[in-house]
Amino acid sequence: MSPRTNESAPEGEPDEVTTAAPQPPHDASAPEPEPVAKPVAEDKAELPVAEDPSSEPEDHPPVADERVAAVRRVSASSRRWRAAQLGLCAASLAVALTAGAMIFGALRDGSGTAVAATPGAVSPQLLASGDLDASITALQAHLRTQPKDFDSWATLGLAYVEQARTKGDPSRYPQAQQALDRSLKLRPGNESALTGRAALAAARHDFTGALTYADKVLKENPYSERALSSRIDALVELGRYADASKAADLADSRRPGVPVFTRYAYVHELRGDVKTARRVLEQALGTATSRGDVSYVATALGQLAWNQGDYASALKYYARALAADDSYLPALEGRARAQAAQGDQAAAIKGMEQVVERYPLPQPLVELGELYEARGHAGDAQKAHDQYSLVTAWVSLAHSYGVNADLDTALAAADHGNRGDALKAARAEWARRHTVHTADALAWALHVNGRDKEALPYARQATATGYHNASFLYHRGMIERATGHEKEARASLKSALDLNAGFSPLGAREARKALGEAK
C-alpha cells in the first residue's frame, strides 16, 4: 500500500463505514465493537484566505487537459534543466500517501460521517458521492450564501487536498490552505480544520507537521477516526515503526473500521507479516459497503499480492476495485503493472498510457517510460525520454506549490538523470526522516555515484524490518556485488526475483543479468 507517502497515495482513501464496526483484526474472536458516534474532522491552515471560495490561484489549471498542458509547458520551458534530473524508480510508491508511502491518501477517511455543523452546512458526505468536482462546486455555491460556515470551509479545504492528490494537481494545495485558514478564522481550533491541516501537511510530505496536528485533535477528541489514521500515517512516514504499531493498536481499539484496518495491515506488512496484513485486508474488504471502501481495500490487496509475485490474485483484486469504481487510479496503475509482470506488454503499455493521459503523476510516467524502454520498438527511446522529462516537470511544479518531492527526485535522477542531483535529494530526504524507503533511496543514490561502501549499510537498513520488497532486495544485491560480497549478492538478487520476478521492467532484467554473470 503506499504511504503516504507515497504516502500516498496513492489514490483515494476510503469513506468511513457507517454500519456496525467489524471486529478488531488483532482478535478475530472478540465481540463486534459498537460504532462510535463521534463527529469526524476535516481541515486547517495558515495563509491569507480568498473571500470567494471559487476563486482560483493564479495560473491554476482546473481541467485535466489544461493540467496536462501546464505540465508539458513547464517541461518544454526547462528542457536543459530537466535533462539533468529525469526518471523515477519503478519501485517507488507515491504514498504516500501517502503515501504516506503506503498512503493511497489519508483524505477520505471517515468522510461518510458529518462533522458538527452550523445550520445549512454541507456535510462531508458530499465528498463520498463519487464526483469530487461536483462536490467542490456545491460547496463553493453554499459558501457564497453561508460564508461563515466554518465546517463547510474545512470540508472545501479537504476536497481541494483530495483533488490535488487524485489528479496530480499540486496547485490546489494553496487553495486548500486558504479554505482551512478561513475555517480557523471563523472558529479557532475547530477539530475539522485541525484534522484537515494534518491531511494537508501529509500531502505536502511534512509528516512532522501532520503528526503535530493529529495529536492536537486527539487531545480534544481521542476517538477522531481521521486523526487516529493520520497519526499512524505520519509515524510510518517518519520511520517510527514501533510507535506506528502502537498507534495502530490504539486506533483499532477505539475506531475499528476500514480506514484503521488498512493502516493496521500496512504496519504488519512493513514488519514482514504478510499473512496478518492479508487477513486484515480481507476482513476489511468483507465489511466494506461503499464503492470507495471497496475500491480502496481491493486495490490494497492487489498491491500486497503483486509485492509477493502473485499476479493472478493481484489482477483479481484490481478487477474487484474497478468494478466498484472504473476510474480508480491506483487500481488502473496496479492492473497495468501486474499485466507487465505477466508478460502482457501491450496491455500494460495501453493501460499505463491511459493513466498518464488522465493524471501525469511521477510513478505512472516512469513506469510507462520503462515499459517503452523494455519494449524497444522504433521511437520508444524518445517516448521513454518524454515520460522522464514530464516527471521532472511535475516535480518542479510540486516544489513551487510547497510539496517536498526530494524522494521522487532522488529515485528519478538515480535511474534516469543526473546522479549528483539524485544524491543531493536523497541526503536531504534522509535528513528529514529515516524510513525503509528513504534508506533504499539513499543507498541507491550512493551506488550510482560509485560510493558503494557508504551505500551498503543503508541498503541493509532498508531490508532490516523484514518488509518484502523486491526492488529493495535488488538494490541491496547490486550494492553487495559492487562491494565484493558475491555470495550475499547472489542471495539478495535471487530473493528479489523469487519474491517478485516482474518487480520492474528494467530492474528485473538487470537482476537476471547480474545473476547470470555471477554463476
Q: What is the role of each PLM region?
A:
Residues 147, 188, 222, 255-256, ...:
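Short coil turns that delineate tetratricopeptide repeat
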Residues 152, 193, 227, 260-261, ...:
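TPR alpha-solenoid repeat register
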